[in-house]
Amino acid sequence: MDVSRVTACSFPLKEKDLDYTFQVISASGFEKIDLVGRMPHFSVTDPEYDLDELRRVIDKYGVALANIGSYCGRGFSDGSKSGRQAALDEMKQTLDVAKEFGAKSIRIFPGDGTRASMGEVVPYFKESAEYAEKVGVYMGIENHGGEISGNPEACKEISEKVGSRYFGILYEPCNLMAAGAEYKSAFETFKDHIVHVHVKDGRANAEGKWERCMLGDGEIDYQWVWQQVEASGYDRDYALEFEVGNIEPVETGYKKWLNTWANM
């Protein structure tokens, strides 16, 4: 499959500095990065974070910023108005940096993740989406295991309530399966709201528990994912997310994943 639209998530290198992280991802054959939104990789709130260092490693290794895997939106459930405003400011600042560096999207979180809080967080996401449209950067809730992010119907509901094409879902088939949601039916539920895609693989073990594995060794049919997502009109990136350091070091594993994707 097309490798020109593949990126590498920096999450498996989250404890490493930016220079080492970009070195590994570049050496693995990637030209774009999905940068996790925590120190030392990224922050708009930590005064020690240096955007000039990010510029330096991008230029040094020729790896472009494709997506920021931020944690923006969590503060929309804060108990104080000032806390929610601070979260909104963080969201807008992150969108500004994404635009400045040419990233197409950012990952976001649906407040505290509970369905009961949806009505409280939607107004903040509406304002965020208006700003996102102005700067041309998409925002996506990543499928995790929460009441919203791990529930396809809730993902669709919050997307419809916000009502912006710049707000939607970061489709993550493997995370959905881990949460007990079948990834193909989930796609059908929220396919009109997909703004980004994460790629990793997994399978049920002998006890029926979902476990991650090397890309191509699991149950996720990524040819199906590619065909369906492309048919929906999606034209952005697919981020490989290597989270199997217990099987192989990321330093050698990412190159294998890129080759696996290319040969699918």
Residue ranges and their predicted role:
Residues 1-7, 66-78, 107:
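N-terminal small/glycine-rich loop or linker at the start of catalytic domains
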Residues 1-7, 14-31, 55, 59, ...:
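Histidine-acidic metal/acid-base catalytic patches
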Residues 12-14, 37-39, 71-74, 107-114, ...:
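Active-site-proximal loop/turn and secondary-structure-junction residues that shape catalytic pockets
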Residues 17-20, 57-64, 76-169, 178, ...:
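Active-site acidic/histidine proton-transfer and metal-coordination neighborhood
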Residues 34, 67-69, 107, 140, ...:
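Conserved beta-strand positions in the central sheet of alpha/beta enzyme cores
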Residues 34-59, 110-116:
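Glycine-rich, proline-tolerant flexible connector loops at the mouths of alpha/beta enzymes
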Residues 39-43, 74-79, 112-116, 178-180, ...:
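A short acidic, helix-capping loop that chelates divalent metal ions and anchors anionic groups
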Residues 44-51, 80, 84, 88, ...:
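Flexible, glycine- and charge-enriched loops at secondary-structure boundaries
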